[in-house]
Amino acid sequence: MEVPGDRFYTKTHEWVKISENRAIIGITSYAIEQLGDITFLEVKPKGTLIKKGEVLGVVESSKTTEKIYAPVSGEIVEINRDCGVVEEGSSEVPIGLEKIVEDPYEEGWIVVLEVKGDLSSELRDLMSSEDYLKHLKEGH
């Protein structure tokens, strides 16, 4: 299972990659494997301020519907529409969701947040790739 070492992970299977004060967020390959075919992915609108742990969006699949949680606090500044991610309340038709499945850690990112808090405290309780792999081996 692919778990890149250049980002942080949550117990709910989101990943975050930090680039200066920006946080690129997606879901892990493990989450995708558990979900099955992704049919819809909706996130809060651009400009929304969101706190760490709050619901960022929802992903629907052939098996279930799951919430996506914000691993850090910030303002949504970018939404990956190229991968079929749509804004909450939008009438857009999702096109390109397969990119999230095929390349969840690069092309398949979901949103970018501009981090609004102290970055080190925002990252404090997130897992490294090694810790995330241990978490998965423990059956989570």
Curated annotation (Swiss-Prot):
List, separated by semicolons, the cofactors it needs: (R)-lipoate
Residue ranges of domain Lipoyl-binding in the record: 22-114
Q: Does the keyword Coiled coil apply?
A: no
Checking InterPro entries in the record gives:
2-oxoA_DH_lipoyl-BS, Biotin_lipoyl, GCV_H, GCV_H/Fam206, Single_hybrid_motif
Name a single GO biological process.
glycine decarboxylation via glycine cleavage system
* Record text on cofactor binding: Binds 1 lipoyl cofactor covalently.
Q: Which residues carry this modification: N6-lipoyllysine?
A: K63
- State how it assembles: The glycine cleavage system is composed of four proteins: P, T, L and H.
Family under the similarity heading: Belongs to the GcvH family.
HAMAP family, A to Z: GcvH
Identification of the protein by name: Probable glycine cleavage system H protein
